[in-house]
Structure formats: structure tokens, C-alpha cells
Amino acid sequence: MDKTILKKKLVLGSVNFTQKYGVNPKQIKLSEIKKIFSLAKKKNVMIIDTAESYITKSNIFKNLNKKFQLITKIIPSSKWTSLSYCEERIKNHIKKYNNLKIKTLLFHDTKILFTKNGPKIFNNLEILKKKKFFSQIGISIYNIKELDYIIPKYDIKVVQCPYNLLDKRVINSGWYSK
């Protein structure tokens, strides 16, 4: 195993908080979610991975310690070419998460980056980053080959991709070491 991977920070995934997902598809009860947040804080796991598509209940993040930060995913459409629309969507997104700080904003689906609207949308997000709505822009991918197009064209700081005992595509492709 590549020991550099072990140096990365742990992030708390939240998709099962509102949806049935993964190898053990169960939705977690609110009482259990509170226990998970408490344990995460105790163990200094202060980053939560989430997405606008995960939130169906607004009370999950209510009263959560403001020291938690988010890595959150969005699915922009062509409407995001409007800076004011982008800003409004991000503000609404932040409100849904009880005004927690967004550390990293990820494209949940990168298809828009391959279109003529991609550069304009990315530029709008760069403007919002400068306004301190979030600290970094990244992508969430399943197809490692997308990196060949996206990385040279956009200033991506974070790539979220599958990695586990059975799926080491990011390592085998050479992208992890770049």
C-alpha cells in the first residue's frame, strides 16, 4: 500500500444520512447521526463530505459545531453561467448546511466542464472563491480519464475519486503522484 495515502485526512461521508447508499444500503436515524457527529468531533474528524443532492432533511446539520467544514458537491447547469445565479445557489447551499464553512466545492458531475459553458461556470466559481464562499474548487469523478481533459484546462485543487482495496485506478493511472 502506498504510505502517502495514509497521511491524508479522514473525511466523514454523509450520503447515508438521507439516502440508502453503498454496500450496506441503510438510511441512518437522526439519533445515530448525532452520535456520529459527536464521535467525529471527539476524534478530530472535522470535515464532512456532502452534496446538494444528499440533503432532504434540513435539520441534520442544525446545531452542529461551527468548527466542522464541508467538502460539498454541486451539479451546475447552463444557468450557472450567470454569476448572480451562481452566488444565489451557493448562498442557499450554505444555508441548508447551517452556515458551515465550505472548504472545498466539487463538481459532482463534470460533464458541464466539457461544454462551451464550462469555462464561464468555472470562472464564476473562481470569483465566488475570491469572495470567500469556499476555499478550493475540485471535481468528483469515477472515470480517471476525465483528468486528461480537465486538469490541463482548469485550476483544480482537489480530485475526489474512488480508492479502496479493489479499486486503485487513480494509483495505477499515475495521476495520484502528479
Residue positions per predicted region:
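Beta/alpha (TIM)-barrel catalytic core signal, keyed to glycine-rich beta->alpha loops juxtaposed to Asp/Glu
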Residues: 109-178
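Acidic-and-aromatic substrate-binding clefts and catalytic sites of carbohydrate-active enzymes
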Residues: 49-59, 77-84, 112-116, 166-171
